[in-house]
């Protein structure tokens, strides 16, 4: 059985250097790292990860908790986190909280029990008091798309209210005055903030907000379909819809075409998130950029800096949304 001593002899480096390479320590030159990895490959050496973990008090694993495993938004986020961590020699364990308080708590407990060195969490159902209580845990937790003032240095968040404001203001700038809104679930803080931004834009421009033209739905295509169905049945006039996310927008666009509406001439639509399919819809969806890839990378960099003591560039904790202008809004000016 090959030992670390044989790897050290073949690579002509110290045992400490071999250990640093196996632990992903950045204080090893690329040339030395390649020598050690080549020696390990030649000898067929596989590190005993359990023993390594016990010796270093590190598992080199990071937990990720997201509301859902499926879907373009969280897929992008998880991919960004995993890519950044894998490049540093770390692995991830992923579990889902399904936007349910008990399942989110269970997910965090599971990741802690798996001896993850840190956790990156996108939680929606647990309250701020629970999150504050996690500060006592020895496992550091980074929160994406959640802001808790007392834990600001562990939070990475987006100004969702501003995003909702920009979305509706964009419709207004194109001459739309009768604007409907399909919001996400009002149990979710980002959905609440986006709806608040929509209302602020309407109020600032002196436009009427009709309850019959606001619908609370799931952050899924079905939310968009049901929302547009409700608006059409209300017989209220509207020329545009501000959608809580791109999946809602996609559902609304599908329902509109199925019922003979031409986009954007008969109905203008704006989304939120700028997920990968937004530019492939017809017409191409005008939307609000939610920099989920960058936020995922930032979360991973925070873990590498704070847990693994790897030097990183300055960390950005708060992101501003931006408009991605495409083809789904008709100009009525």
Task: Mark where each language-model region is.
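Structural motif
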Residues: 92, 96-113, 164-165, 216-234
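An alpha-beta-alpha
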Residues: 167-207, 212, 315-329
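Hydrophobic alpha-helical segments within soluble ligand-binding/sensing domains
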Residues: 156-181, 196-200, 221-229, 249, ...
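Amphipathic helical "hinge" segments at domain boundaries
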Residues: 46-110, 114-118, 196-199
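Short, solvent-exposed amphipathic alpha-helices that sit
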Residues: 35, 73-87, 163-170, 189-208, ...
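Flexible loop/hinge segments that line or gate small-molecule binding clefts
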Residues: 99, 121-166, 174, 187, ...
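Flexible loop/turn connectors
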Residues: 227-230, 234-333
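N-terminal helix-turn-helix DNA-binding module of bacterial transcription factors
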Residues: 1-59, 333
């Amino acid at each position: 059985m090959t030992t670390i001593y044989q790897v050290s002899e073949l690579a002509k480096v110290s045992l400490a250097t071999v250990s640093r390479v196996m632990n992903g320590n950045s204080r090893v030159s690329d040339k030395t790292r390649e020598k050690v990895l080549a020696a390990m490959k030649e000898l067929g050496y596989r590190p005993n990860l359990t023993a390594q973990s016990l010796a270093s008090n590190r598992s080199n694993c990071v937990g990720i908790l997201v509301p859902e495993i499926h879907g373009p938004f969280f897929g992008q986020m998880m991919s960004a986190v995993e890519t950044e961590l894998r490049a540093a020699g770390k692995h991830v364990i992923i579990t889902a909280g399904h936007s349910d308080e008990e399942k989110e708590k269970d997910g965090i407990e599971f990741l802690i029990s798996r001896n993850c060195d840190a956790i990156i969490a996108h939680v929606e159902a647990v309250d701020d008091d629970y999150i504050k209580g996690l500060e006592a845990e020895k496992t550091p937790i980074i929160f994406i798309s959640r802001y808790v003032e007392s834990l600001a240095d562990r939070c990475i968040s987006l100004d969702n209210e501003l995003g909702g404001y920009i979305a509706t203001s964009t419709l207004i700038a194109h001459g739309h005055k009768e604007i409907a809104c399909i919001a996400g679930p009002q149990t979710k803080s980002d959905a609440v903030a986006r709806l608040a931004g929509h209302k602020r834009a309407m109020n600032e421009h002196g436009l009427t907000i009709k309850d019959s033209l606001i619908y609370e739905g799931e952050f899924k295509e079905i939310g968009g379909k049901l929302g547009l169905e409700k608006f059409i049945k209300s017989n209220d006039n509207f020329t545009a819809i501000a959608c809580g996310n791109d999946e809602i927008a996609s559902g609304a666009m599908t329902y509109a075409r199925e019922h003979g509406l031409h986009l954007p001439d008969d109905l203008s639509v704006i989304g939120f998130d700028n997920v990968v399919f937004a530019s492939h819809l017809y017409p191409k969806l005008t939307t609000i950029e939610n920099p989920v890839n960058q936020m995922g990378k930032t979360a991973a960099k925070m873990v590498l800096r704070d847990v693994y003591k790897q030097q990183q560039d300055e960390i950005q904790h708060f992101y501003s949304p931006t408009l991605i202008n495409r083809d789904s809004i008709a100009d009525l000016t």
